[in-house]
Swiss-Prot record:
It catalyses: GMP + ATP = GDP + ADP. PROSITE patterns: GUANYLATE_KINASE_2 (PS50052). It holds the Pfam family Guanylate_kin. NCBIfam families: guanyl_kin. CDD domains: GMPK. Keywords: ATP-binding, Kinase, Nucleotide-binding, Transferase. Monomer. It comes from Arabidopsis thaliana (Mouse-ear cress). Its EC number is 2.7.4.8. Essential for recycling GMP and indirectly, cGMP. Required for normal development of the gametophyte and embryo, in association with GK2. The keyword Metal-binding does not apply. This is Guanylate kinase 1. One of its GO terms (molecular function) is guanylate kinase activity.
């Protein structure tokens, strides 16, 4: 890629970022951001994905350019960008001329998630995270052995609070069965595509079952949250372990039977399985209960000895007793003016409209950010000031 571009860098002490726009062609706007001993070139298109912004890194010590592994679903190319270096190894990127729900993004270059991925992949890594206004209720991970009643508890939640909870739609590489609809029962995916997305860090958890992949994508969980609902994930202990290791901030609940004898009685009462199948389920359940209680994955343990009482305890743990549903998530993004200048003052980004007869401002407060790559970054507060 050649030598590093000569750029002018605004000084942070003047209240401005060190992000500067550089144009090689009218429709190929790029921006450079100086972070320590590296320069990040953001813009153009990704070398393997023409629908995502490209990222290149220039190392000042070795005087070399290189392409990092880019994790997460990245933003589409735009007509221009403004960028600011934030704490926790993040770069705030504001896209010019973009739809209101696609204007704010974060490129993580040295966050805890990125550092962990660097260790795992043994390569240079960056990760994209979409910025979202407001906050949302934490997703709920519910695990427990087969026959413990967790499915019934979830159904009771969904029936009593239909507008509050939602399920993420899982991905699978198996073929659709009769009456199954893509995007409703599963997202039916090509195996090579799903394998690549798993490698790119786009899945919270996955497993191979009889030669087919099954998994929960980060985007499917975020889509439920974006709709204003609280996502419920009904997954096994291994899946919960993967979610716990991710950046998703969730509540982890494990449901236990009152005893193995009670669990065996429930399985036999179904009348749908052979003796061999029942014994296999009991062996698996015993191992799963042991791991669920002692692994440290689950912060909350429920014993389902009485369904109604267990459900009351579940609602109490989730803060649902006598409370109306209030969700602070807002996904509409920000309406940016056509022409504007951007500056930074402490934890606030000031977007100043630059028309002839206007002094309107948009103040973006980033003091309460939470979440992050490879999911959404939430907690953005916006205040419009009109003159």
């Amino acid at each position: 890629m050649g030598e590093a571009p000569a750029v002018l860098v605004d000084h942070p002490e003047n209240g401005h970022s060190n992000g500067v726009c550089v144009k090689s062609e009218p429709e190929n706007t790029e921006i450079t951001v100086d972070v320590g001993d590296r320069i990040f070139l953001i813009g153009g298109t990704h070398e393997r994905n023409n629908f995502s912004i490209g990222v290149q890194i220039y190392d000042k010590i070795s005087n070399n350019w290189f392409s990092p592994i880019v994790l997460g679903t990245g933003p589409k190319p735009s007509k221009g960008y403004s960028a600011f270096v934030l704490e926790q190894g993040r770069i705030l990127v504001i896209k010019k001329g973009s739809p209101r729900n696609d204007s704010i993004w974060f490129l993580e270059v040295d966050s805890p998630y990125v550092r962990e991925q660097k260790k795992l992949l043994r390569k240079e890594v960056v990760a994209w995270s979409k910025g979202v206004r407001g906050n949302a209720e934490k997703p709920i991970v519910i695990s427990g052995p087969s026959g413990v009643g967790k499915g019934t508890l979830i159904s009771m939640l969904m029936k009593e609070f239909p507008s509050m909870f939602g399920f993420s739609v899982s991905h699978t590489t198996r073929s659709p069965r009769s009456m199954e609809m893509d995007g409703v029962h599963y997202h039916f995916a090509d195996k090579k595509v799903m394998e690549k997305e798993i490698k790119d860090g786009k899945f919270l958890e996955f497993a191979s079952v009889h030669g087919n992949l099954y998994g929960t994508s980060i985007e499917s969980v975020e889509a439920v949250t974006d709709s204003g609902k609280r996502c419920i994930l009904d997954i096994d202990v291994q899946g919960a372990r993967s979610v716990r290791a991710s950046s998703l901030d969730a509540i982890f609940i494990f449901v236990c039977p009152p005893s193995m004898k009670e669990l065996e009685d429930r399985l036999r009462a179904r009348g749908t399985e052979t003796e061999e199948q029942i014994q296999k389920r009991l062996r698996n359940a015993e191992a799963e209960i042991k791991e669920g209680i002692s692994s440290g994955i689950f912060g909350l343990i429920l014993y389902n000895d009485n369904l109604e009482e267990c459900y009351k305890k579940l609602k109490n743990l989730l803060g649902l007793d006598g409370l109306a549903h209030v969700n602070g998530v807002e996904i509409e993004g920000i309406n940016l003016p056509i022409e504007y200048a951007v500056s930074k003052m402490e934890d606030k980004i000031i977007i100043q409209e630059t028309g002839k007869e206007t002094r309107n401002k948009i103040v973006v407060d980033i003091s309460s950010l939470n979440g992050g790559a490879p999911g959404r970054t939430r907690g953005i507060l916006v205040d419009a000031i009109k003159f």
